[in-house]
Amino acid sequence: VSSGGPITQDNTGVEYYATLFAVDESPIQEGLIWVGSDDGLIHLTKDGGNTWENVTPKKMPEWMMINSIDASSFDTGTAYIAGTRYKLGDFTPYLYMTEDYGKNWKLITSGIESEHFTRVVRSDKVNKNILYAGTETGMYISFDKGNSWNKFQKNLPIVPITDLTIKDNSLIVATQGRSIWILDDLTVLHQLSQSTDEAKLYKPKDSYRMRGG
């Protein structure tokens, strides 16, 4: 078809496809850039865009919209992607991880409910095992690089999470229609393990008392 792919009921004009929807450069290797498109393709360049390689997961369903890409702050070959197919009637969550520059990908959605389709995934900047995922119906967290996920809703409203970012060790959450939320200071999360059977003391970040006058 002239649109380049399936026609949906979306009226934003994005179904002409071949449009880059997500871009992220490695924070630890200059010129290593990941891009994802609205027709389900992922490409990687290691030389600042001079040459590109198609590294799309072989088993990923076609016509996936790549909503977000997150390049690891620890390993140059590691990246995470979140994709959606809800416009095609598929509400399945799709999160993938690679640790070898896209040669092999692993689906990492265990623990996320079957119709909570995923809009964004971000990796922690301090603890390489912690991941955050935003779905159509709220937040999830993983303490084992995506092998398992737990709901992380707290006092967030049940609302689509459209983007996540970490700034000054705080998690900033963008929602669709319910403002921006901030989880201040991730220090305690960095000290959590997957599970614990005994009491544990957590070290908070340093605080300062200031005198006025």
Question: Which functions belong to the PLM regions below?
Answer:
Residues 1-211:
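Beta-propeller blade termini and top-face loops
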